[in-house]
Swiss-Prot record:
Protein name: Biotin synthase
E.C. numbers: 2.8.1.6
GO terms, biological process: biotin biosynthetic process
Cofactors that this protein relies on: [4Fe-4S] cluster; [2Fe-2S] cluster
Catalyzed reactions per annotation: (4R,5S)-dethiobiotin + (sulfur carrier)-SH + 2 reduced [2Fe-2S]-[ferredoxin] + 2 S-adenosyl-L-methionine = (sulfur carrier)-H + biotin + 2 5'-deoxyadenosine + 2 L-methionine + 2 oxidized [2Fe-2S]-[ferredoxin]
SUPFAM superfamilies: Radical SAM enzymes (SSF102114)
List of residues binding [2Fe-2S] cluster: 113, 144, 204, 276
Amino acid sequence: MTEAQTACATTETPVAAPAAPRWRVADVIALYELPFNDLLFRAQQTHREHFDANAIQLSTLLSIKTGGCEEDCGYCSQSAHHDTGLKAEKLMEVDAVLAAARTAKENGATRFCMGAAWRNPKDRHIEPIKEMIRGVKDMGLETCVTLGMLEEHQAKALAEAGLDYYNHNLDTSPEFYGQIISTRTYQDRLDTLERVRDAGINVCCGGIIGMGESRRERAGLIAQLANMNPYPESVPINNLVAIEGTPLANAQALDPFEFVRTIAVARITMPKAMVRLSAGREQLDDAMQALCFLAGANSMFYGDVLLTTGNPRAEADRKLLARLGMWASEASQLSA
């Protein structure tokens, strides 16, 4: 090596090592394994540092395009691969969607989510969905859509329409994922989330528990979410609804205390996220839902139907919040 090469070698900037994950799976498992009271106490402390602990955001979810999906997700009634008796429908008209949003607002919702059963939207679908987004925002509602995988230009188009959140769940841990779906890779999901983030849209990303996964695999899902940089602003936690005709129709029901633990672990690992009680809430009695709020859930999907499965009735939800001394709040009013 020449003198010049030696000088060059000694002044070369060393390559930085990859940043260590904020949450190792082992760390998340350790949270799960805390005594129940200790876990909820820590989660509630974390929750109060960032949010009004008695405020809940009410969200309504509308299926704007039902059934006929190309994906083979083992939990989903809308997959064309499963015989669930669900008839495929076309994309709803804009006026019909806006009428549903208006009703949701009248019933107390402050967030309106629109879901379409697609592997990915075609470009021709984007324009009417942009109209829906603008119309819902004009009502003063927060907007979220879930349409499947997105291309970069599609994410940018939704951002230009003013979309607040894009939902694209990871569903489960990387290790368990292959047992649930074969038509879309884990990396496909991560790529869509990156495009959403790059477009300047808030990320809504969570998963489903109770699909037969182990606690370690539940911890793997939470670690994946918590280690995103930044972690999602919105984290829906779904409790599997076992639907006749799907591969998971006979899945063993999850211990409800494990569901509450998952809410608490999500709150601790993602302290500033909206943690949302999503599908499967009708499987939890009032006491378990109250424990979920204590564990840090600060949003719930509200209304009689959640995509194609049942949901506790709106009136029952209002009564539960009143019994608990809690109240529905705008997202902007939730922070402490």
